[in-house]
From Swiss-Prot:
GO MF terms, alphabetically ordered: ATP binding; ATP hydrolysis activity; DNA binding; excinuclease ABC activity
Protein name: UvrABC system protein B
One of the protein's GO biological processes: nucleotide-excision repair, DNA damage recognition
KW ATP-binding (keyword) present: yes
Homology family: Belongs to the UvrB family.
Domain notes: The beta-hairpin motif is involved in DNA binding.
Domain of life: Bacteria
Length: 656
């Protein structure tokens, strides 16, 4: 093994592994950046993240990696943090655990208030991202599609930083006022992130962007004598510094002079809009807008904040009407790299968010709930994102035509795995007898002590199949969307250990399940047209059998559809490339050896009514989040009200 750390580089990849298989060639081609945008077509299990890490080191470019969901973003964040321990690897996702946006449904005359649950830990990580981007050059940001939503102006964030240097004089009263203006709060008793205190000649600040250290600045009279980072628990000195920049405690900071200008501009826009409604003889809308906006203005004057403050972002940032909002991409100066992971899913999400936001807000504006300037607080359009792009790599096992077109057909393939495993053999069988044939296939897997994934189209089918397999003495479990992360991990571990020999699921078996013991994937109703059985989905499902040297896929279908044939042909093409490579280089495929994750089993106890209600609240909360995500706001409100009723019954609010 070879360590690849380069001590004189800005980005230092630290690993004991060297690129193998197709990785060296892919890294070389991607690092050349022959076109501004490129596609990395990487088969399942070929180590795409490791390839990207090597490109980051070769290019020495600050990087943003965008994933299509929080879970995948978290996985990428952990991987890159391990690969770049000396660099600032940051995590930038939405800080809402639950978010139901404000909305108005004109057809039913229903107004829906904004409702949200904020995750303070994620909020702190977002501030950490902005702080690193403002103070360092060696930054890798891993984010979700929330990265295209607005954030604080880069110039404002830098402008508000407090800079301390050993030997310089400072006015202590001014320091206190500045910290308060940065949204820090005085707390002489206990320091937590976003708090500070003076104890004699010592200033201690717990930064809003980290929980790893407290900044201690010792003064001699008005001169800085010492700057240290100390452990918040032990008070042990971690680092002694010559200088330090303390950034804002929150993502958004507005000084008083800017706030005064913003309030003046909001009043002016309000008057113009009220006049417009009155001229249209829409008096009710004019009155409603005046009431809501004046209430918000009073809060802004008193506290510098109001409910729905995001609707006034353009005024608070002193931006021009219809201007592009600030985003994390504006924090990059010069050349930088954007990596869009699982681009076949992420890119459509990025494309659709602008129009979804516009549609919702336009109703609020048209009916007098919000000022027209609310439209200027929005996600970037894809065209705006493209204007900010410098270098782009789209990463996917199944890239779409859109990515290939954007890259001018510059597609770099990574098909050979570091384990030299080849794509599985595909067999098509008639589905008339698919259940009995499946049982025979599962039993045959026992000879090699391997496992089986079965993917079906509906929940009912999954439940019925699971029950029938149990009756036939097959050790089977059903994995579905409502299973929690810990329970999911337990199921996978039990499958790997042999407690189960088969797992039945729907689309959850498509991506993200890395189980080397699975040698057989069975696809029911492969010939039914639709998204779950299109070419890309089928290739993703097929990839679940690519972790085992005995990998096979059985498609149950009465005829071979065009989408099936494309998936079969592409898999055969990849398999041929992989086998030719192995023959040329005398490589033998070997099943991945992956240690089992230890998870303490959960012992279930008899539940009281309160415990049952608490469990139901958690389940309802999931449904509420799903309804809000699908913009089914009426259903979300009904579920929320049901939750409130249950909370009253058990006498306290359950944290969900």
């Amino acid at each position: 093994m070879k360590n690849q750390t380069k001590s004189n580089s800005l980005f230092q990849l630290s690993t004991n592994y060297i690129p193998t298989g197709d990785q060296p060639e892919a890294i070389k081609k991607l690092s050349e950046f022959k076109t501004k945008q490129q596609v990395l077509l990487g088969a399942t299990g070929t180590g795409k993240t490791f390839t990207i890490a090597n490109v980051i080191q070769n290019s020495q470019l600050p990087t943003v990696v965008i994933a299509h969901n929080k879970t995948l973003a978290g996985q990428l964040f952990n991987e890159l943090k391990q690969l770049f321990p000396k660099n600032a690897v940051e995590y930038f996702i939405s800080y809402f655990d639950f978010y139901q946006p404000e909305a108005y449904l004109p057809s039913k005359g229903i107004y829906i208030e904004k409702s949200a649950t904020v995750n303070e830990a994620i909020k702190r990580l977002r501030v950490s991202t902005l702080h690193s981007l403002s103070t360092r050059k060696d930054v890798i940001v891993v984010g979700s599609v929330a990265s295209i939503y607005p954030t604080s102006s880069p110039s404002d964030f830098v402008k508000y930083c407090l800079w301390f240097v050993v030997g310089k004089d400072y006015d202590l009263k001014t320091i206190k006022d500045r910290l308060v203006s940065l949204n820090y709060v005085v707390n002489k008793q206990q320091l937590t992130p976003g708090k500070f205190r003076f104890q004699g000649d010592v200033l201690e600040v717990f930064p809003g962007y980290s929980d790893a250290f407290v900044i201690r600045i010792s003064f001699f009279d008005t001169k800085v004598e010492q700057i240290c980072q100390i452990d918040p628990l032990t008070n042990k000195i971690l680092n002694q510094l010559f200088e330090i920049k303390i950034g804002p405690a929150d993502e958004y900071v507005v000084n008083q002079s800017d706030l005064d200008i913003a309030i003046k501009n909001i009043k002016q826009e309000l008057q113009e809009r009220v006049n417009y409604f009155n001229k249209q003889n829409l008096v009710e809308r004019a009155q409603r807008l005046a009431t809501i906006t004046n209430h918000d203005l009073n809060d802004l004057k008193a506290w510098g904040f109001c409910s729905g403050v995001e609707n006034y972002a353009r005024h608070l940032e002193l931006r021009m009407a219809n201007s592009t909002p600030y985003s994390i991409f504006d924090y990059f100066k010069g050349d930088w790299l954007l990596v869009i992971d699982e681009s076949h899913q992420t890119l459509p999400q990025l494309n659709g968010m602008y129009n979804t936001d516009l549609s919702r807000k336009q109703s609020l504006i048209d009916y007098g709930f919000r000022l027209p300037s609310a439209l200027d607080n929005r996600p970037l359009s894809f065209a705006e994102l493209q204007q900010k792009m410098q270098k782009v790599i789209y990463v996917s096992a199944t890239p779409r035509d859109k990515e290939i077109s954007l890259s001018q057909n510059n597609v770099i393939e990574q098909l050979v795995r570091p384990t030299y495993l080849v794509d599985p053999i595909i067999v098509v069988k008639p589905k008339d007898n698919q259940v009995e044939d499946l049982i025979e296939e599962i039993i045959n897997q026992r000879q090699n002590n391997t496992r089986t994934f079965v993917t079906v189209l509906t929940i009912k089918m999954a439940e019925n199949l699971t029950e029938y397999l149990k009756e036939r003495k097959i050790k089977v479990a059903y994995i579905h969307k409502d299973i929690k992360a810990l329970e999911r991990l337990l199921l996978i571990n039990d499958l790997r250990r042999g407690e189960y020999e088969c797992l039945v699921g729907i689309n959850l078996l498509r991506e993200g399940l890395d189980v080397p013991e699975v040698a057989l994937v069975c696809i029911f109703d492969a010939d039914i047209p639709g998204l779950p059985r299109d070419e890309r989905s089928l290739i993703q499902i097929i990839g679940r059998a690519a972790r085992n040297e005995h990998g096979r896929v059985v498609m149950y279908a009465n005829h071979v559809t065009e989408q099936m044939q494309k998936a079969i042909d592409e898999t055969k093409r990849r398999r041929t490339v992989q086998m030719e490579y192995n023959k040329l280089h005398n490589k033998t495929p070997k099943t991945v050896v992956k240690p089992l994750t230890f998870v303490q089993p959960i012992k279930l106890k008899a539940k009281s009514n309160a415990e049952k209600n608490a469990a139901l609240i958690k389940q309802l909360t999931k449904e509420m989040k799903k309804a809000a995500a699908n913009q089914n706001y009426e259903l979300a409100i009904e579920i929320r009200d049901s939750i409130f009723e249950l909370e009253k019954e058990i006498g306290s609010k359950i944290k969900v």
